[in-house]
Every structure is written in structure tokens, then in C-alpha cells.
């Protein structure tokens, strides 16, 4: 505990990026404890819980009358999956609350750039899909399916190693997304969000070459806003803490589909 407090005392500044602090904190905890995947059981249970809700979410997506309707509903389901997060004060979820959130996702949509994202997707040929958490990745399959139905080549990226409850290759297999995507790669590292000076050459090549990028979760929202983006990124996440909610100018516990830059 002393080492963690010492780290926070050193790194916690007004300009600090929360995702960067999270990466350093969790790496330190793993090193001290000797446990490189403390969320392993929670991730497995999250995948199992999400898989039980997948058919329900898919039915809602398929209720969309047009391709654009189904795309938007799939975006909403993917955002709702982002609710499956641990260790955030005041943020809780159950299977019942998730089912309700899936059904009422549009009511909580505070930033809606899905129309712009759809138009970009229609013109694109290749997409990089940056996943966030285990459990959540199950719902991501619905959006990957819709992108594939639009004729896009979809490459899914998971983390290169355990960091909090972020999805890894093991979760890509468990969720079924590996069967839907054209290819699954890793970032080559285990950072919260995206830290470009740590990623692998393979990931960086894909990141620089695709036409469009979808990025899930607050970690990517926190880190991508630190870069001068050169191509369109669609951020899909739930505002589960006040700093992120305030940055995007919305209330807490709202759904966000934000096109950047």
C-alpha cells in the first residue's frame, strides 16, 4: 500500500491522464503481489454473464428496419456493454440492470454521432475495433457483425496482457468475437487505453493503415484525446465517472457515441 501511495503522490498532478495512472498503479500492484491477472475470475464471470444476454441484445439490434437503424442499435448495445466495469466508486451493475439498459439505451444517449459514423463506415473499407473490457467484448460482436454486413474488413484489437479487466486474446476466444472478425490482434502491451509509444509494430501498422477506428471505453477516451488524431475515431463508452462526464459535457451514467477529431 505504501508503494501505491508513493506512486500516486508522485504522479497525481492536474495534468495527469487517469488511464496512465491506472496503468502504472496496476502494474505496480501486479509486481508487488506476484499476480499478473488479479481480475481473471471477474473477467470469466463477466463473459459468462454477457453471453447469457447476447441473444436478447441481438434481437433488439435486428429489430432495426434499415441498415442504419441496425448499425445504431449495435452501437448502443456495444456502449451498454461498457457498463460492465469494476472498482469505480458509485458504479454498479446487475444482469437485470444490464437488460434494462440494453432496452432503454437510446434514452441515455447524450452524445449521438452514430449518423456521422455510419456515413464514414459506408465509405470505408477497413476498420480497427479497439475493445475494452471482458464481458463488454461479447456485445462488441454485434457491432462487428453489422460492420461486416456493410462489407467492411474488421480487425479487432485486444490488450497484449492483463491490465484491470481489459479483454485479452483469451476473452476474444471466449466471447466469440474471434469468429466474427476478419482478424484479431493485440496492442502488444497492457496499457489502459492507448499509449502509442508502447504498442507493437504490428498494431501500429494496422492503426496507421485502416480507414476508420472504433474505440471502446473510458480508457481509450481518456488517452485518445491526448493525441492529434489524423483519421476518424468513433468513441463508444458510458460516462461512469465525473471527470470523463465533465470533459465531454454530459451527466454521469450516460451513453456517448463521439466522433473525433
What residue spans do the PLM features occupy?
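Structural motif
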Residues: 126-128, 211-212
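C-terminal functional extensions of proteins
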Residues: 158-160, 164, 168, 173-261
